[in-house]
Amino acid sequence: MYRWEEKLSLKGLPLGIPLLLNGAVLTKGPVGIILPLFVFGVYLLMLRKYSLLRIFKTLLYTGVSSLFIPMLWYIEAWKQGGNDFLNVVLAENFGRFFHLSEANISYDLGHKEGFWYNFVTLAAGFMPWTLLLFFSLFGVSWRKPQGSFGRWVRNAWNTILSLDKIRLFSLVASVCIVFFYMLPSSKRSVYLMPAYPFIALFMSQAILYLTEHRSKLTRVFAGVLTAVASVAFVTALLSMTGTVDLAALASQYTSGVSVLQTIEAVGQAFHPSVSTIIVLVLLLTALLISYYQLFKKINIKMLYASIFLIFCVHLFIDGIVMRGIRNENSSRAFAREIRGAYPLNKDNVFVMNNLRQYTNLYGLNFYLGNCFHNFETEQPQTGYFLADERDYPKVLERYAGVYTFEELRTSGRILADVKARVVLSRFARK
């Protein structure tokens, strides 16, 4: 859309725009078209190049042309799902945004956070560069604005309007996306992903400036980063060779079951494998380059070395540490265990489906092939029942006079998606 305005001055309508927006609506719902048009509309207004009527017609034609394929899908889905489907669509897409009642759906929308959540999420998402920019603020020479506050605001506004198109569009996109997702009650870190590339443009320019004009700060940052990465590399190496047992070491300082399970999972992830060795070799290479550049005086190369090191650290965290944690705490292993031990099929597995009162076992449902049935509504004669360890006693108490439950298996670990152990039982109507 930016190229459409820059190259064609809004003449015609490139086929790629409605096709991409069609795909956005099908994957993310109405926000897939509302948010891009909101950003583009504000950008066109700030260009002060087109009339309000021209901007309105541009957004209208773009929006209408992007609804044909999604409307066909929504109509067919509504024919199959009826009002239940419509209620979920309205709740998920408009109930979240407008803080509407959730009475027409059987679960809480959740993810309710304060307005500050988005800013904390962005700061965490850009780590460790956020730390570099934060500490750079202490060396800034703050000057009192000249003239009245109104004059200062006008000068700031004129400065923004005088930005080149790429920077102006990036600024508009960053502010509009963050502002847009401050409005709904539901807030999640993934909602802000569209803003990251645009914010990164300004962050990269700030980091380049610091590298050229405040090289000491950049080198201190690189040194601290290299030291922390070195500790992580040595820890992984000691665990891999069996020199250090991370779980045994941690047990001397904490007795928390979930903490010890997590540390044990990380230790298991450090066991030798092709992917683990490749990541550690890359991390070692990045460390050697960083140590070498720390003793050189070419600042830009030091920055490049830091970028490569941060990339390898992310590989280390996501490719080894988090992979181990997710594999150990995933519902997949327990699903495989109970499916192999008991004759579970698409007709005999039941759960409590009132998600306002009971935990959603969505992970197990996925790994068992989406075979769950609603125990409350179907009231079956016999079958298998799944619930987490917090809900299971409530179910036993509620149906004590109607069903008998025989506990068969409990997950050995706390499953990440439900934050509790899950119990499998066999039931029969009395």
Region spans (language model):
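Membrane-embedded alpha-helical bundles of multi-pass enzymes
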Residues: 14, 18, 34-37, 191-198
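A generic structural signal for nonpolar/aromatic side chains embedded in well-ordered alpha-helices
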Residues: 1, 88-89, 97, 207, ...
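Specific aromatic-rich, kink-prone transmembrane helix
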Residues: 1-6, 41, 199-202
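Membrane-interface transmembrane helices that cradle and orient dolichyl/undecaprenyl
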Residues: 1-14, 207
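Membrane-embedded architecture of ER/inner-membrane glycosylation machinery
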Residues: 142, 146-430
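Transmembrane-lumen/periplasm boundary regions of multi-pass, lipid-linked membrane glycan transferases
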Residues: 4, 19-20, 27, 32-185, ...
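Hydrophobic/aromatic ligand-binding patch that stacks against planar heteroaromatic rings
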Residues: 22-23, 364
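Juxtamembrane helix-boundary/capping and inter-helix hinge elements in multi-pass membrane proteins
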Residues: 8, 82, 212-213
